[in-house]
From Swiss-Prot:
GO biological process: proteolysis
Protein name stated in the entry: Serine carboxypeptidase-like 46
The organism's place on the tree of life at top rank: Eukaryota
Functional description taken from the UniProt entry: Probable carboxypeptidase.
Species assigned in the record: Arabidopsis thaliana (Mouse-ear cress)
Family: Belongs to the peptidase S10 family.
Enzyme class at the top of the EC tree: hydrolase
Carbohydrate-modified residues: 137, 170, 246
Length: 465
């Protein structure tokens, strides 16, 4: 057989295999396509949701929700969003309370006018197994889960998810999240970089983490100064909270099941003065008194601007919506090993001591590898206050020898100050979001969208109206 004919046949075979692979992937993704969510207004973009099995032997599967970009999805990046906890849902919190296209309102969904899928294809992942609709056939899979397991599972998820959606393979990929995602996001990004050394699968373009847990002592001990500076605790209590028992010491003792009498005394006094009617995740706002959830998990923002109203019990509505059978059917979701979908898992046994393991060093390794890192903080959050995050970013910049390229200054959203920002080198940025809570996109959606656009574009935040 002539050489040219052999080459032609080989090329044809390769093209045929590629075509078959594409057809197979199309069938897989088509099965996950959402026709329409109950109560949803008409939209022009596609939605998908379903499962990716990350462990066939133990039947461990992670649940995802993809909201493609409102316009030109083919030309826009893919953004993975992870909520923290550990053990809280990126579907219920991220997609349906923060930056997704819809928010529940009674029996219907209303459009989020500041949804992040205006700028990107948004992928929300319920992780680890045991969170939300993600499940395992054996309850033992929910025990002893830790950061290492979660990072590996998230990597496997992405590898297999790309088999369903190969059209996203070469797309610019960003990883974002908040709170304990200060562990999830850097750890996943680190594994992706390591994997790319052999396989070059991920087109990672940057990470963004909001009010993130990055270094146990610095993050949590900044709470005392925040409480005091905002008038939530008295001078004597502030002194006790910084000298007799700081918050990282209390948490460390609490996680080990042996809280000292001194820490019990100090935290009791702090609790009395701050009161249980203050949302620690947003100290300026009201709480949802009849909430079916723990108060500490409810984000209750005030109106962002004149004429805008916000439901302070939004998480209640999300819980009710996602527990509807018709909604679960539309999402291709099912409950395994639990009777009810919850915002934060009540079956997951996570290794709480992992919170004490710093990830700021991993963030530094990402910066050195050329991955842009954006750390942002809602300035009304007392749980992971901006002061701790700002200190950590500044310290990291000094350790890496990065010069300041954007001096500390205000940035604008519309005709108002959106917050303050500083940039080091070309890869490390910090910003505050004025008036925002722990969950920035929920409490300040317009400002969060401005920040998100700048992050995706690799640009400094606006310094003019």
């Amino acid at each position: 057989m002539p050489r040219l004919q052999c080459l032609t046949m080989a090329t044809s075979l390769i093209l045929l295999l590629q075509a078959l692979s594409l057809v197979s992937s199309t069938i897989l993704s088509r099965a996950d396509r959402i026709t329409r969510l109950p109560g949803q207004p008409r939209v022009g973009f596609q939605q998908y949701s379903g499962y990716v099995t990350i462990d066939e032997k133990k039947q461990r599967a992670l649940f995802y929700y993809l909201a493609e970009a409102e316009t030109k999805p083919i030309s826009k990046p893919l953004v993975l969003w992870l909520n923290g906890g550990p053990g809280c849902s990126s579907l219920g919190v991220g997609a349906f309370s923060e930056n997704g296209p819809f928010r529940p309102k009674g029996s219907i969904l209303v459009r989020n006018q500041h949804s992040w899928n205006q700028e990107a294809n948004m992928l929300y992942l319920e992780t680890p197994v045991g969170v939300g609709f993600s499940y395992a056939n054996e309850s033992s899979s929910y025990e002893g889960v830790n950061d290492k397991i979660t990072a590996k599972d998230n990597l496997v998820f992405l590898q297999k998810w790309f088999l369903k959606f190969p059209q996203y393979l070469n797309r610019s990929l960003f990883i974002t999240g908040e709170s304990y995602a200060g562990h999830y996001v850097p750890q996943l990004a680190q594994l992706m970089i390591q994997y790319n050394k052999k396989h070059n699968l991920f087109n990672l373009k940057g990470i963004a983490i909001g009010n993130p847990v990055m270094e146990f002592a610095t993050d949590f001990n900044s709470r005392a100064e925040y409480f005091w500076s905002h008038g939530l605790i008295s001078d004597p209590t502030y002194k006790l909270f910084t000298s007799s028992c700081n918050y990282s010491r209390f948490l460390s003792e609490y996680h080990r099941g042996s809280v000292s009498s001194m820490c019990t005394k100090v935290l009791s006094q702090v609790g009395i003065e701050t009161s249980r009617f203050i949302d620690k995740y947003d100290v300026t706002l009201d709480v949802c008194i009849p909430s079916v959830l723990s108060q500490s998990k409810v984000v209750s923002p005030q109106p962002q601007q004149v004429g805008e109203t916000v439901d302070v019990c939004l998480e209640d509505e999300t819980v009710n919506y996602l527990n509807r059978r018709d909604v679960q059917k539309a999402l291709h979701a099912r409950l395994v090993g639990t009777r009810k979908w919850t915002v934060c898992s009540d079956v997951l046994d996570y290794e709480v001591l992992d919170v004490e393991v710093p990830t700021i060093n991993i963030v530094g390794s990402l910066v050195k590898a050329g991955v842009p890192v954006f750390v942002y903080s809602g300035d009304q959050d007392s749980v992971i206050p901006l002061t701790g995050s700002r200190t950590l970013v500044k310290r990291l910049a000094e350790e890496l020898g990065l010069r300041t390229t954007v001096p500390y200054r205000v940035w604008f959203a519309g005709q108002q100050v959106g917050g303050w920002t500083q940039v080091y080198g070309n890869t490390l940025a910090f910003a505050t979001v004025r008036g925002a809570a722990h969950e920035v996109p929920f409490s300040q959606p317009a400002r969060a969208l401005v920040l998100f656009k700048a992050f995706l574009g690799g640009r400094p935040l606006p310094e003019e109206f």
